[in-house]
């Protein structure tokens, strides 16, 4: 579950690399600003346009998952007749029910396709909402990464200097890890605190 929230490992038919690439662009940009240099990645300048696209790609994943989960929670609490009309959705309301909602959208957005069996998800709401999440989380990142690649391909080659942050350095690895932790991992911490962590502590 935690890996699906971050989506930064290689695999998943290229999706792990695709999202890791967005985090690297953000890490390079922030690192360049910290030392007062124009950010460079693979000997090409990284400017505002690339950063904006990478930010959209990185933030889209938690956005669609958390919005979907919030919508499901809202309907579960404030539209019980709608939920009952679809079979009631969950057998275990509370911490575990929220975990099931969260996992359903996380799985849809992260090339997984699995789900908790306690959630009755073969309904109109779940099929359509998860389909929308799936489409957004697949195609927008692909379009964004291709756009970044096109922008970088059109830029002049810049020779490396002593001030260039090399992508095979420990500093770059640490910066990329920090970006992934802050942008991806912490985005999900509040909802996990109310679901999976709360359920674990209550056992």
Residue ranges and their predicted role:
Residues 1-6:
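Short, small-residue-biased leader/transition segments that mark boundaries at the very start
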Residues 96-102, 176:
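Short, hydrophobic/aliphatic alpha-helical segments
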Residues 19-26:
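Hydrophobic mid-bilayer segments of alpha-helices in multi-pass membrane transport proteins
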Residues 26, 115, 181-184:
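Conserved catalytic alpha/beta cores of large enzymes that bind or transform nucleotide phosphates
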């Amino acid at each position: 579950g935690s890996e699906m929230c971050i989506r930064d490992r290689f695999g998943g038919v290229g999706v792990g690399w695709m999202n890791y690439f967005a985090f690297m662009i953000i890490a390079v940009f922030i690192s360049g600003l910290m030392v007062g240099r124009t950010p460079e990645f693979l000997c090409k300048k990284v400017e505002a346009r690339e950063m904006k696209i990478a930010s959209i790609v990185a933030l889209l994943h938690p956005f669609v998952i958390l919005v979907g989960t919030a919508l499901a929670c809202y309907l579960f609490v404030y539209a019980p007749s709608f939920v009952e009309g679809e079979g009631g959705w969950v057998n275990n309301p509370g911490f575990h029910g929220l975990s099931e909602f969260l996992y359903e959208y996380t799985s849809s957005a992260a090339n997984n396709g699995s789900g908790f069996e306690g959630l009755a998800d073969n309904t109109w709401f779940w099929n359509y909402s998860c389909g929308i999440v799936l489409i957004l989380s697949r195609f927008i990142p692909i379009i964004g990464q291709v756009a970044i690649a096109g922008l970088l391909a059109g830029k002049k080659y810049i020779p490396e200097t002593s001030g260039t942050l090399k992508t095979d350095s420990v500093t770059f690895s640490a910066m990329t890890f920090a970006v992934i932790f802050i942008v991806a991992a912490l985005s999900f911490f509040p909802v996990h605190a109310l679901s999976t962590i709360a359920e674990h502590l209550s056992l």
